[in-house]
Amino acid sequence: MTFNELTKLLEVEGFEETAAELHGIICGRLAGGERLHGDKLRNALLASLHSEEELIDNALPSLSRLYQQSLAGLTDPGFAFKPLLPGEETPLAERVEAMAQWTQGFLDGLADSGLSGETLFSDDAANALGDIAAIAQAGFDGDGENEDEVDFAELEEYLRVAAILIFSELASPDDIGPATSTTLH
C-alpha cells in the first residue's frame, strides 16, 4: 500500500489519523514486539487510534494488509523497510510534517505495545529513540531548497535505519528469521 492509497482510504473512511501517523503507530507496535492478527489487530487499532469502531471495522482488510506489509519490511533481510511518507512530488514542508507525524506515531505505537518501563535498550537503540523523539518535533524553515532536500533525505534514511534497529533489538528470533552461517573449509 502506498502513501497516497492509504491517505485516500483514511479520507474516504473519515479517520482522524494521517497516513504517516497510522503507519508509524503500526511500526511502533511491531517494534515493541506485538504480533497481531484478526481481532487482536482490530482491538489494538481501537486502543491506539482516535477513530470510531465502525471506521476501523470498514477499513480492517486494508489495515491488515498494511500491517503485514510493515512487518514484511521490518523483517526483510535486505532491509527494504521504509517509513510510509509522501513522495518527492509533495512540497518539502508537507513531507517534513508527515515525517514528524510518522515519528510521533512510532513513539505512540511503541508505548502502546506493552513494553515495560524497565525495557533495556542498547546505547545505539536508546540514542535512536532519542533522535526519533527529536524528529517528532521537526519543523521546516525553508531556507535553502537543495540543502533542505538533502537534509530531508538523510533524515528519512536515518529514520529507516533507526526503526529497523529498534525492531531488531526488541524482536524475537522468530521474527528475524534463521541466522545464516558460512562454514569455511
Task: Enumerate the language-model features and the residues they cover.
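Domain-length accessory/inserted modules outside core catalytic folds
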Residues: 1-103, 107-185
